[in-house]
Amino acid sequence: MRLVLRLAGAGLTAAMAAIHLSLWDDGYRDLDTIGPLFLLNGVVGILLALALLVTPVRLLGPVAAVTALFTAGTLGALFLSLTTGLFGFDESLDADLVRPTLYVETAGVLVLTILAVTAFSHRRRPRR
């Protein structure tokens, strides 16, 4: 089960990174503050996806937790940009990739949180 969660979490994190890099390449790079943040999100997302795949089981809990928090922060930033605006940028629900991003990031937060909880609970089990 943990392998499935690990692969799903890495895949969702990589998808989130790919979306941000694609949007950055499609013109978001020209936006003050938002542009560099999209690039940073894409690069960090790739690194976290790779970390989820190669991290030993004993360290998986912290890596999954950090990735879940990163994804939740990204999702929160999207909600802000859809409602009040973020750094002077207002996003529309009808804009390219907004809905897929909402789905990917929401699923990512759920999967990564479950992975972190199961990984931490596995670490705390007494050995027989």
Features from the language model and the residues they span:
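Membrane-interface extramembranous regions
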Residues: 1-128
